[in-house]
């Protein structure tokens, strides 16, 4: 049943061309929005959507009265080399007249339209790939420790040398302790975790370098709205302040260390 729901969720996402919230999909098939988020990441829905769209465009038949086979080949070769003469030769036209043929083909309205269509597809593909890279930098830059661990205070029963402690009325004696718990790997975004290890001192989780990610994002300021630009600047100032307050000059990425409790002898 879970597999069917997972496939159904992807189908809904693709039907809406990705323009639907996790909550809306979750309400439709009866699972939590968090589950949808996990499926979306693990099954790479965005890539699947783009691949399906690209295959659909590739499979779109070109009417016989638009372009013949050699003209279509010329278009494909031309967008790779932008050399009309060589493209004409590779497409099967006579080498002796390839220079004239190539020039004539570029002036053909239908050929020119097909070249523009192919170029647009190529640009869209490169743009999506570039935005995917930027999205990774965004995730690194604004990573929150609470995405990976939960921490706070909780009450537990006090324990003495002889075991759990109780009061005169046989009620458990409680005490407040601090805790840090690592979230399950299936519930977190592992793409920005560079290292996770279990050593003698406890669990260590190292996240990718936030400052480097912010510097990369700064190179693409013109792609972002003003509000997001301010968010980037605020995060850089915050990191700079944290660095200044440290006693050392460490440039290491964020590392979360959860130490083991030492047993008393």
Swiss-Prot record:
Instruction: Spell out the Pfam families in the cross-references.
Output: Phage_terminase, Terminase_2
- From which domain of life does this come? Bacteria
> Which residue ranges are recorded for the region named Disordered?
241-265
GO BP annotations, alphabetical order: chromosome organization
Presence of the UniProt keyword Transmembrane in the record: no
Q: Which UniProt keywords apply?
A: Viral genome packaging, Viral release from host cell
Q: Does the keyword Membrane apply?
A: no
Q: How does it assemble?
A: Dimer of a small and a large subunit.
Its biological purpose is as follows: Functions as a terminase.
> What's the family?
To B.subtilis YqaS and B.subtilis phage SPP1 terminase small subunit.
PANTHER family xref list: PBSX PHAGE TERMINASE SMALL SUBUNIT (PTHR41328:SF3), TERMINASE SMALL SUBUNIT-RELATED (PTHR41328)
Instruction: Name the chain's protein.
Output: PBSX phage terminase small subunit
Please tell me the species this chain comes from.
Bacillus subtilis (strain 168)
């Amino acid at each position: 049943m879970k597999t069917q729901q997972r496939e159904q969720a992807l189908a809904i996402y693709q039907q809406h061309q990705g323009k639907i919230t996790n909550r809306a999909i979750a309400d439709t098939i009866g699972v939590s929005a968090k589950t949808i988020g996990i499926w979306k990441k693990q099954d790479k829905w965005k890539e699947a959507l783009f691949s399906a769209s690209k295959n659909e465009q590739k499979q779109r038949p070109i009417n016989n009265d638009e372009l013949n086979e050699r003209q279509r080949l010329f278009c494909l070769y031309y967008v790779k080399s932008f050399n009309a003469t060589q493209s004409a030769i590779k497409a099967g036209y006579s080498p002796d007249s390839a220079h004239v043929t190539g020039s004539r083909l570029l002036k053909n309205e239908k050929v020119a339209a097909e070249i523009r269509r192919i170029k647009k597809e190529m640009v869209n593909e490169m743009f999506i790939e570039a935005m995917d890279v930027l999205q990774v930098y965004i995730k690194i830059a604004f990573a929150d420790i609470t995405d990976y661990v939960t921490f706070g205070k909780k009450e537990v029963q006090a324990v003495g040398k002889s075991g759990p402690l109780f009061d005169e009325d046989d009620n458990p004696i409680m005490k407040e302790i601090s805790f840090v718990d690592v979230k399950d790997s299936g519930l977190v975004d592992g793409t920005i975790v560079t290292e996770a290890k279990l050593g003698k001192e406890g669990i260590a989780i190292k996240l990718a370098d936030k400052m480097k990610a912010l510097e990369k994002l700064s190179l693409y300021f013109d792609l972002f709205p003003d509000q997001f630009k301010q968010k980037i600047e605020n995060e850089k100032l915050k990191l700079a302040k944290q660095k200044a307050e440290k006693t050392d000059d460490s440039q290491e990425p964020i590392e979360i260390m959860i130490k083991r409790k030492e047993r008393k002898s």
